[in-house]
């Protein structure tokens, strides 16, 4: 990791991958935002944010996907820093922020939003602002519709149902830690492009969740959808064979996450997950093929 000007305490936080187990598009608001109904879990694999007090502000990036990250103020991490500083006042100390970028960019697993959420949480602690979750979520929502759910993921990690444009959050009980494989062949999809390609925007909401046990959860998921999948496939047809590959490797359930193009697969146990991950990585060098586990529901 890049060295910092060391002028005080430091904080490191995981910015977990956000996995949409199901995503139903139920309508569209007058302002253009789509109404969504989503079942979301968070993985133990993700980016990492390291922040410490410094003599001046700085931002550095490392990791396998660092090359695609903008270093200017258009970056969501810096937008989060500036938004929180605006709220807390001009006397807050300068900070050195380092992003370890382990997740593919524009891949449907919330990387940039999760990075911004982890930044808000870390700076809230480092600057001793003591803002509650609701205030941080309101600041996050001003930066992006999925910031509140990513803030929940970075703070708690527990599964949730997200509705509205993504800001209405409710915990979901009964979901165990899921052995999951995340796969992306390097395809990047811009979320606005996928939404523009939608042909149907009025769909049924999620059925009431039935999540007690992995088998029951996967049976439930087979009754759900990712309504963005047809639009994503129209832009990136290679998504479909990725899903077929995951099913052929023994997945209990496989689907695309978010607006794509990352796909995920749930496996029965650690052995099945490890075997599938190794086979796919060996057969497809250069792919992002990462075994992980989702965080479980609250006990």
UniProtKB/Swiss-Prot annotation:
The answer to keyword tRNA-binding applying to this record is: no
Pathway membership: Isoprenoid biosynthesis; isopentenyl diphosphate biosynthesis via DXP pathway; isopentenyl diphosphate from 1-deoxy-D-xylulose 5-phosphate: step 3/6
MF terms per GO, please? 4-(cytidine 5'-diphospho)-2-C-methyl-D-erythritol kinase activity; ATP binding
Family matches, as Pfam families: GHMP_kinases_C, GHMP_kinases_N
GO terms of biological process kind:
isopentenyl diphosphate biosynthetic process, methylerythritol 4-phosphate pathway; terpenoid biosynthetic process
This entry's Enzyme Commission designation comes to: 2.7.1.148
**UniProt keyword annotations, A-Z:** ATP-binding, Isoprene biosynthesis, Kinase, Nucleotide-binding, Transferase
Q: Which residues form the active site?
A: 18, 146
Task: Cite the InterPro entries for this sequence.
Answer: GHMP_kinase_C_dom (IPR013750), GHMP_kinase_C_sf (IPR036554), GHMP_kinase_N_dom (IPR006204), IspE (IPR004424), Ribosomal_Su5_D2-typ_SF (IPR020568), Ribsml_uS5_D2-typ_fold_subgr (IPR014721)
**Reaction equations catalysed:** 4-CDP-2-C-methyl-D-erythritol + ATP = 4-CDP-2-C-methyl-D-erythritol 2-phosphate + ADP + H(+)
Q: Main EC class of this protein?
A: transferase
The residues the record assigns to binding ATP are 104-114
Q: What does this protein do?
A: Catalyzes the phosphorylation of the position 2 hydroxy group of 4-diphosphocytidyl-2C-methyl-D-erythritol.
Family stated for the protein in its record: Belongs to the GHMP kinase family. IspE subfamily.
* PANTHER family in alphabetical order: 4-DIPHOSPHOCYTIDYL-2-C-METHYL-D-ERYTHRITOL KINASE, CHLOROPLASTIC
What is the name attached to this protein's record?
4-diphosphocytidyl-2-C-methyl-D-erythritol kinase
